Amino acid sequence: MTAKTIDLNADLGESFGHYTMGNDSAMLDIVTSANVACGFHGGDPEVMAETFRIAREKGVSVGSHPGFPDLWGFGRRVMPFTPAQIERIVAYQIGAAQALATYSGHRMTYMKTHGALGNLTERDPAVAEAIVNAVKAVDANLPIMAIALSHLERIGRERGLTVFSEIFADRAYTEDGHLVSRKEPGAVLHDADFAAARAVRMVQNGAIETISGKMLPTRIDTICVHGDNAESVEVARKVRAGFEAAGIAVRALT
């Protein structure tokens, strides 16, 4: 059955100090949910507060976006943390986002992991379990966005969390439904028209479309457009326009 609504999310608030990442203000005119970096892979208190403030003014839902403490690698390198350490770095970042969202007059309403930490939840159940432990310890009522078909999606639901299943508009998928490594050619989709058409097909069919065109059925609640690419704003605009043209309403989940 064709989905009647979909959430459109983006990873934002990733600038820090003198370094600027993406065009957050433009993206916040398009997306319905913003995953805000918490200072470990990107972001700092000034950027976080400003992102929450603009999101509040534009009516965009916000979530914490914890990652590995790796500013120079942008959180895209796997780091050798134990599950117990992962629990603490996730709890720390959720708390920072909650505090600065409240400070900025907004409310943080979900959590989504970033980069290498998020990718590990596809393949490593111990990492997924650690993230669920952290969320339940900090706020058992906090929903999570989890990569569709991942261990985090499964374990989160098994342990009673509200889980929003996420696919990606601008990333290629392997034949088993995992994200193609960014080290591989074609892992990131830069053609906005192609990305938008594929996003509509996936949501209409309730399935991930792999690099060969195979469709893998899955629940889909939200779709991500990354905010740090040169084409991000164009891709986001065309994805949203594609949904609306197909009769799929774009609305926040929280």
Swiss-Prot record:
Keywords: ATP-binding, Hydrolase, Nucleotide-binding. It catalyses: 5-oxo-L-proline + ATP + 2 H2O = L-glutamate + ADP + phosphate + H(+). It comes from the Bacteria. One of its GO terms (biological process) is carbohydrate metabolic process. Its EC number is 3.5.2.9. It holds the Pfam family LamB_YcsF. Coiled coil: none annotated. GO terms for molecular function: 5-oxoprolinase (ATP-hydrolyzing) activity; ATP binding. Disulfide bonds: none annotated. InterPro entries: Glyco_hydro/deAcase_b/a-brl, LamB/YcsF/PxpA-like. Gene3D superfamilies: Glycoside hydrolase/deacetylase (3.20.20.370). Forms a complex composed of PxpA, PxpB and PxpC. PANTHER family: 5-OXOPROLINASE SUBUNIT A, UNCHARACTERIZED PROTEIN YBGL-RELATED. Belongs to the LamB/PxpA family. Catalyzes the cleavage of 5-oxoproline to form L-glutamate coupled to the hydrolysis of ATP to ADP and inorganic phosphate. HAMAP family: PxpA (MF_00691). This is 5-oxoprolinase subunit A. It comes from Gluconobacter oxydans (strain 621H).
